[in-house]
């Protein structure tokens, strides 16, 4: 897995394949988070059994590098998060995938089913869980504010049709968004994990605490 990690962005390509069906060398948010979980798990094993081994540090920082690569890619589209909170228009959604080597957008707003709330929720959930495990993922107040905005972004998943884990909308492949239980469940888990969570980990300061409003 780590042999495929981009040395600059920290992102992982979904595949090395470029064929008639498309270019799969892009970095999907969902694929990246799920892929790096194995590295995170191995880093926790080293932390417990061989904390002084160099691999304990390398594995941990490889996870940080990927998660921050995704964070930076999303923060470049922070204007879309603000727009979506007001419009709930799928065209205002954060992109579902980015260029592996730059973290920049690779397809237009209307060229992909970008509104995949399970992927965004998974990212938010793992920020909480990885931070709780001892990783330092969030560095500044700008980043805290953005994660707080992501919480608002996913808060209406229970009533929001999206393209979900299937990416193509409803199951007959017509590209029509629908409410997906996989998205609803992941959003619920993310909101529960983030409620009152301090992104600055062991800091006694309250500035890094994420708030979930009652309606969320």
Regions found by a protein language model. Give the residues of each.
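Acidic, mature catalytic/reactive cores of soluble proteins
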Residues: 1-216
């Amino acid at each position: 897995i780590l042999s495929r990690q981009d040395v600059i962005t920290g992102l992982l390509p979904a595949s090395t394949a470029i064929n008639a069906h498309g270019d799969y060398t892009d970095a999907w948010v969902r694929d990246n988070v799920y892929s790096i979980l194995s590295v995170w798990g191995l880093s926790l094993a080293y932390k417990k059994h061989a904390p002084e081994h160099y691999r304990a540090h390398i594995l941990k920082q490889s996870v940080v590098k990927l998660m921050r690569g995704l964070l930076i890619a999303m923060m470049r589209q922070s204007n879309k998060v603000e727009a979506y909170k007001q419009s709930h228009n799928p065209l205002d959604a954060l992109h579902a995938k980015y260029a592996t080597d730059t973290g920049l957008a690779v397809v237009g707003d209307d060229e992909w089913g970008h509104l995949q709330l399970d992927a965004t929720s998974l990212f938010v959930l793992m920020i909480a869980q990885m931070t709780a495990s001892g990783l330092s993922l969030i560095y500044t107040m700008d980043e805290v504010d953005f994660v707080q905005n992501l919480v608002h972004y996913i808060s209406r998943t229970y009533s929001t049709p999206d393209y979900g884990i299937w990416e193509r909308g409803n199951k007959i492949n017509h590209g029509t968004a629908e409410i997906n239980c996989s998205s609803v469940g992941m959003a619920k888990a993310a909101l529960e994990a983030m409620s009152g969570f301090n992104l600055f980990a062991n800091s006694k300061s309250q500035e890094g605490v994420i708030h979930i409003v009652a309606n969320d």
